[in-house]
Amino acid sequence: MTADLPDFVPDFEKTGGLVPAIAQDAVSGEVLMMAWMNEEAWHRTLTTGEAHYFSRSRGSLWHKGGTSGHTQHIRAVRLDCDSDTILLLVDQIGGAACHKGYKSCFFRELKDGEISVCSPLVFDPEEVYK
């Protein structure tokens, strides 16, 4: 998955080196997660076909699913009109994008004044991240 389009590059300079990257299920359209990408994560994502992000807490590159096996295979990449937000259309391998074990990181919902879990729990994080 390579892109040689000169204007198809996020504006990392404008955003201080990190841009938000939203992962969305390519089939269902469900939003799975939001993480950050720096230039290295962007290039690795495009060259490997799997999502790579930058972990602000660890200060390092992060291959999504590198520990859990729940990788994200890239089907398409989109940039917003200002080139400062990335949208990844992905096949979520292993069924879960969230490190807490849920299909989506957006697993909590406030609706009609009630808070509920709206995304299935796929795995036990204590078993996966030993």
Curated annotation (Swiss-Prot):
Database matches in InterPro entries: PRA-CH (IPR026660), PRib_AMP_CycHydrolase_dom (IPR002496), PRib_AMP_CycHydrolase_sf (IPR038019)
Keyword Transferase in record: no
Top-level enzyme category: hydrolase
Cofactor note: Binds 1 Mg(2+) ion per subunit. Binds 1 zinc ion per subunit.
Protein name: Phosphoribosyl-AMP cyclohydrolase
Principal location class: cytoplasm
Keywords recorded for this protein, A-Z: Amino-acid biosynthesis, Cytoplasm, Histidine biosynthesis, Hydrolase, Magnesium, Metal-binding, Zinc
Record's subcellular location: Cytoplasm
Chain positions recorded as Zn(2+) binding sites: C81, C98, C105
Cofactor(s) essential for the protein: Mg(2+); Zn(2+)
Residues at which Mg(2+) binds: D80, D82, D84
